[in-house]
């Protein structure tokens, strides 16, 4: 695979994480760049590991991974999105709550895993091609780091416009990503 294809693949794989990061950044009041970078690093690290895991599994269980990855991502994203919506409605009455909390490490890791299962499936496919899997995985991780950090910062501006309802919007974004993953699987 040439460098152009690798870069296109990397940024293509980072789009779900970008959208999820917008959703994560929206409910936070004025997140610092360090918070956005923390999110980007977590998403980037997970997105680097999943194609490597998928590549390793390619020889062992490619049929299972390809048959179930969309369902796993769908369930995780519906759960996380639903949780954000519920928290958004609970917090909607308390308009003076300042500042909004940071997202917990494990919540970010779970979201990153849910949005990177497609990268694991890509890793399975890459096992059957002549590619440098380390370079490809690092490219995917770096693109995801950049796009997730950017997504958090974009989400911050959306959140400042719509206020506390941003958590509901973020939950809807995650659910939308889950539905899109399932739709793409069944409708190509």
Curated annotation (Swiss-Prot):
Its main location: membrane. The chain crosses the membrane at residues 3-23, 66-86, 106-128, 143-163, 168-188. GO terms for molecular function: manganese ion transmembrane transporter activity. It is found in: Cell inner membrane. Pfam families: Mntp. One of its GO terms (cellular component) is plasma membrane. It is a multi-pass membrane protein. It comes from the Bacteria. Signal peptide: none annotated. Keywords: Cell inner membrane, Cell membrane, Ion transport, Manganese, Membrane, Transmembrane, Transmembrane helix, Transport. Probably functions as a manganese efflux pump. Belongs to the MntP (TC 9.B.29) family. PANTHER family: MANGANESE EFFLUX PUMP MNTP-RELATED. This is Probable manganese efflux pump MntP. It comes from Shigella flexneri.
